[in-house]
Amino acid sequence: MALSEDFTELQTLSNGRSSSIFPTTNTPVDPEEEEEQSVSACTQPNEHTQMMQTGQNGGLKSTRLSSSSSSSSQLTDAQRLAVLLPNALPPGFCVCCSLCCNGNQQDCALFQSAVPSAALHMGSCCVQGVPCFCMQHHWPEHLQNQPNMATLSPPRPFRFPKNYAELIADWPVVVLGICTVLIVVCALVGILVPDLPDFSNPLQGFEPRGTAIGQRLVTWNNMVKNTGYKATLANYPFKYADEQAKSHQDDRWSKDHYDRKKRQAEWDFSKDSFFCDVPGDSYSRIVFASAEGKNLWNIQAIKSMCNFDNTRVRSHPQYLDLCQRTTAASCCPSWTLGNYIAVLTNKSSCQKITERDVSHTLNILRSCAKFYHNGTLGPECWDMTTRKKDLKCGNLPRKCTKYNAVYQIFHFLVDKDFLNPKNTDYLPPNLKYSMLFAPTEKGETMMNIYLDNFENRNSSDGITTITGIEFGIKHSLFQDYLLTDTMYPAIAIVIVLVVMCVYTRSMFITLMTMFAIISSLIVSYFLYRVVFNFDFFPFMNLTALIILVGIGADDAFVLCDVWNYTKFDKPNSELSETVSITLQHAALSMFVTSFTTAAAFYANYVSNITAIRCFGVYAGTAILVNYILMVTWLPAVVVLHERYLVNLLTCSRTQNHQSQGAATFWTSLCQVVNKCLFSISEASRIFFEKVLPCVVIKLRYLWLLWFLALTVGGAYVVCVNPKMKLPSLELSEFQVFRSSHPFERYDAEYKKLFMFERVNHGEDLHMPITIIWGVTPIDSGDPLNPKNKGKLTLDTTFNIASPASQVWILNFCQKLRNQSFVYQSEEQDFTSCFMETFKQWMENQDCEEASVYPCCSQSTFPYRQDVFELCIKRAIMELDRSTIYHLDSKTPGPRFDINDTIRAIVLEFQSTYHFTLAYEKMHQFYREVDTWIQEELRDAPEGLSYGWFVSNLEFYDLQDSLSDGTLIAMALSVVVAFSVMLLTTWNIIISLYAIISIAGTIFVTVGSLVLLGWELNVLESVTISVAVGLSVDFAVHYGVAYRLAPEPDREGKVVFSLSRMGSAIAMAALTTFVAGAMMMPSTVLAYTQLGTFLMLIMCISWAFATFFFQCMCRLLGPQGTCGQIPLPKKLQCAERTSENQSTVNNQGKAGACYTTKHEHYELEPLAANVRNEGKASDEEQEACTQLQNNITSLHDDATLCASHEEPKHEFENGVQATEHSHLHQYAFNTRCTCENSMHQYIRERQRTACHPCGQSRETQCATKQSNHLPVCLNRDMIHAPTNSGHFQHCTPSQISRPAAHRCFSGGCGMHAVHISQQQTETESYISACVPSSSPQESQNRPAHLQFPDVQRCSSPDTTGVCTLNHDTQNAGELAINSQSPQKIPWNHLKTKANGTCVLQDCREVVPEDSIGCRVDKEKTVSPKKFNCFKKNVNAKCNSVEFHKTRTSVPTIAINSKASSESLC
């Protein structure tokens, strides 16, 4: 008992955190002080303590730091301790080491003051443990390096890396350097070599290429461009072309320009000294509405519009340089309602009008409205030269025609519903909108006026408000907004950085991850422009940044989690092995998510729209490049951080500093932050491991019905009513800003409300039918470059000069005029069918003049080929000389080449269809006309058999391409997602459920967008097609986790997948949701739409995957091999590393996988069939929890599916490879079973001098060995239990409530404690945690170091013992010889209801998938039974029961029988 005075009991907290406290005095520890110490323990490592360091390859090295403060008294204490324990404390004695998790550092000290840690030697057992989730634990504290330590290991010789993992582990700086060089080179080449993108025309690339209509439109446009003087085609013969070009080159103006000049000459207001011109489409304009929704026809509103004109437009400094003027002194007045009232009432300005003038003008408008609406009042009714009414409008009152003011008010300034014929004279007029025309040309010159006086200023004065603006700068302003609004993606990136930093607890890893994401865009731009040679870079490519931020963060979270799983599974492994295992699993998981999303983007390549195809290639490439960086750059960053940078930002302080009261503000702040983060992580753990599985499973029927109803509702909204609408705005009015922007409101709302806009945009014009022969409708340009439209391809078989062709064309024109879809004009159109005009001209020519012959009436139709070729040239030239009509590039008729040969002809008729944006009407028009023409061409002669027609079908083709391309892209995305899911899980049922979940997600998402008013335009098409790639990720993660779950039943698999993947999936969804939310304030429509879409798809896909998919798996999920694709036997259990393969030969037959038949969860709501056993006593619950809390394991080996072959006493079990028993929930060692723990223990004893022995706080654990006592403590988390070959019982009197999610204090224990010679030669593999020994032994060793006799393990308070049954067991049971060591799997150890510890037999079962176990019914040897258990407990290492704190939820026994809800 010499040491008992200096030592207190060695303790292991019930939550899995071991501690041993050895105060120098018997002064009790204050509970409150101890509680405070437990919170900050993790941040208080002793700087004198010899710590473990990570070597070059991740190996652990013992590092001893010298301390200048070491005193002689401390050395004396150490020497005295060595004298007291000459055999029990060899040089390899283990002392406390800093922990990864929130352990109590002060509890870890073996000798707080009496025996300083500087005098102790750190053994190899002091290896830092690894937690389970980054969300629930702290990243820097998970790493193998210890705080404030320096690596002093000797330099190792150069070793060339054998594989990629060793390259990452040994040469992370080299890998990072190579990646950095490549990124910099790609950036420089991508920026310097090709031209920078030009976003001045955002509509560029929005036209379809490659469609039948698209090829015709491209060919027609090329034909128009190549028609003219010295061009490929000409309207005139070449001999006359030069003369005609010279005489008409000054007249080749556009029709609008000509008409405008003509109107300017006709309507010259300069004599009236008021208006300079008439309002028109070329002038800047503003739309006003009442601020309170009232009538604008009142004097306050009219004067308010005049004030806006003076203060916002005319007062700008640049206005004087831009306005039109009659004199140098002043600018022309604006065309406003007030100025027109002033003209009609002879007032000088708008400010001079009165209420009487307004009423008088209204009366004039009332009396003249009917003349305007019936078409009799037109712009030509006033002769400005004579200042009198024109004779054409003699029946109209003069007041209606004076100055054409009434016509211009109705046509330009008021909305079309004002004073319409439907309103009677007795109803008050209702003017909703009025327009103001400024005497400035719209365009770039108006940019400064808009930016200074309109963009950020209030648009209302309380009376009127500016609702729409048309300055002609929409696309120019878009380019500026596109760059300035990148601040919102930047804000999103910053917020994602904060979330990642909190999640990983490492600023270095966070910044390097974001650098990898940005680098992905740079490298993909290089590949896009230089390697793929794409010349066109649409503005939509910029939105790839937002999507990539979410995906990159998801990959970082996955790698973080997998890294910690690997370190937890193999804490003693070298760094290269950790990297290898991490990449094996993380690379696959990241590849699944990256490939499915990239495939969804690449699927857009099937679209016919150039911008969508380019965006799909760029975004898909960026995601794949990001994946490559995530498996090269990011692992190297993690290794570099772990080896060198983990200690830079630590907030830990040594115990000496803490005791001296030298804690700084930052240390206190860091502790507070750590406590808050720990509380958050605890809440997260409870939610994802307890609450969420409970909610999902208990309410599964409700969730299924609810989400099925949502799916049906979404499908109804998308497909039936109101369904996804095609775009309703022309391409020229394509929306680029948010809907509330005044530029967009003018195009979308107000343009159709004013008559001059309706007429100019062709809503009252007939659709033309243009038919072409002689040119092949082929788009020979680059479909990925909207600027490259190719060259004109002529039809070599074309021949119009043959008599048969002449007759057929004439008959064709006559048939076409008789069709119902052709508009019959009253005026004779001599240009529609040139053959009719030519025949008539020939018949009217007199043959008396010899020079005319043969082009005269003597020649009969059809004409000879030579006559036709000669006379058609004369007819065209005569037509040009005798009429003022000029033939332009779009005029129907023949087209000549440079040799005067007719190479093409054009016919054009007007149809009865009016231009409309409605898809159905345009579709009917195209199908009807094209079908009739193709039917007629079947009987055409050989020279005219390849004709085709075209019309104003650009918008219809865009609509058609969007509707078809979106569906095809989504279908391809679904096929790829299903394929990837199938290859990942090898299970058809899981893959089918995932696709059903994705379908529901798509329907609900698109339905929500429809209800939000979305139309299927270009941007919407891209976002919707990408929905499949973004929504499949969550279902894939859950599906893979379901298949890898070791539990045999559905409920266990669902709980496993939810608890393991729930946190990472939620974080991925959160980061992407935040990135989308930050885009909402943007002005650019592409950003706001993408933000809306990301928020919706993340919420809906997470909900469907978590509740709908998991409930389907719980209800009808596959069990065993149901739905599994059969694989070759060699592949079923061959998933192993090279190191594992080398160990299999020594362990026995490879290929046998282990599982168990029953499992229990310690979560009451998850009980499928709860057995009502009445009220269990506290002792029962404590005993069951003690059994679970005292199980520990070695994680030094990744034991595979193999039955271990030893010379004697071999146990073999063969079951299916897909199920595993007693597996740690977060370990990657999916083939490891609890029965392997004994063999692991034997190998560990042979390999190390310090053996793990997990202990809880209430236990006193010592296992009697021949020469050594294994007392080194395991650092596993209490909620992540592990295996052991030792049975330990803990007395209920010492149980304390554990703090959840704590791990054992790493390294706190004793190393190779030599025992006196009273020991027996036998070894016991089953021992009680509170041992009892002979009195002599008790006197020679401390109370807590009592060693059990091989035959008994008793509690100090009882005489009950746990013995091995020496008798012959029943059939199928195993006889144990206690005098010889046996290899006893832990999962075969059971307790009877009377407390006896028995060993169950584990029979070899070949055809079945479970292990049969029987409870030994022999009576206990002990005369006094220790009633520790009253029911059998078969606890699996990976069950939920092991992951809970003992006091959180009471233990409930759950019937583990297979669910009756079976699919197979």
From Swiss-Prot:
Its main location: membrane. It is a multi-pass membrane protein. One of its GO terms (cellular component) is membrane. Glycans are attached at N346, N374, N458, N564, N608, N818, N899, N1140, N1190, N1394. GO terms for biological process: adenohypophysis development; animal organ morphogenesis; anterior/posterior pattern specification; blood circulation; embryonic cranial skeleton morphogenesis; inner ear development; muscle cell fate specification; retinal ganglion cell axon guidance. Residues 9-28, 38-65 have a biased composition (Polar residues). Residues 468-640 form the SSD domain. It comes from the Eukaryota. The keyword Coiled coil does not apply. Keywords: Developmental protein, Glycoprotein, Membrane, Transmembrane, Transmembrane helix. PANTHER family: PROTEIN DISPATCHED HOMOLOG 1, PROTEIN DISPATCHED-RELATED. Interacts with SHH; via the cholesterol anchor of the dually lipid-modified SHH (ShhNp). This is Protein dispatched homolog 1.
